[in-house]
Amino acid sequence: MGAGIAGLSFAIRAAEHGRVVVLSKGKVMESNTAWAQGGIASVLPDGLRDPGDGCDKHVADTLGAGAGLCREPVVRMVVEEGAAAIDDLTRYGANFDREAAEGGFVLGREGGHSHRRILHSKDTTGREIARALVEKARQTPNLELLEDHFCIDLVTTGKLGAVSDDRVLGAYALERATGEDRVFRADRVILASGGCGKV
């Protein structure tokens, strides 16, 4: 559930292993990802990164800016996988700003960062990332994007009366165009729908 950067990135990879259905409560280009104007931070490979930058420095910057709210193992994993994620996005067609002469990425430095490591696509970075991911998802075999499907609840064994274990078996969604409730059965359900305050 969710057609932003997290949901589509996961769905594209998961579709290599089986059928994937992505539910979006609205149009796929209306995700929070598409509205993001800032850049995306990554320590790029040697030769492309700001001299002296590295993953340890990015981790330290993130932990410092996070004021004790970040989990270091999670931060380290995200930072260390950042360059591969940027590579995926560029292979999917995302166009980040580049130096005219050399063709390398234009790297910006923003608050909380000790080095230039922010990639932009003009002032619509999120929209460009979303565009590339949506296009890639639509071209991916085994992947179906369903817009205007609002998830109502998860289907669980507990709700079906099973007492021994409580597992997720799928989701109930409202198809807005028809007003009908639909049931989606699934071996795995991934919640990638933004803030989890009401989960």
Where does each model-flagged region fall?
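Short glycine-rich, flexible loops that bind phosphorylated cofactors or substrates
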Residues: 8, 180, 198-199
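Core beta-strand elements of the Rossmann-like FAD/NAD(P) dinucleotide-binding domain
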Residues: 177-188
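Structural detector for helix-capping/boundary residues
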Residues: 3, 149, 187-188
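Glycine-rich His-Gly loop
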Residues: 3, 25, 194-195
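Glycine-rich loop(s) and the adjacent beta-strand/alpha-helix scaffold that form part
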Residues: 188-199
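Conserved N-terminal/central alpha/beta ligand/cofactor-binding core
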Residues: 19, 24-169, 173-177, 198
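N-terminal Rossmann-like FAD-binding beta1-loop-alpha1 element of flavoenzymes
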Residues: 1-22
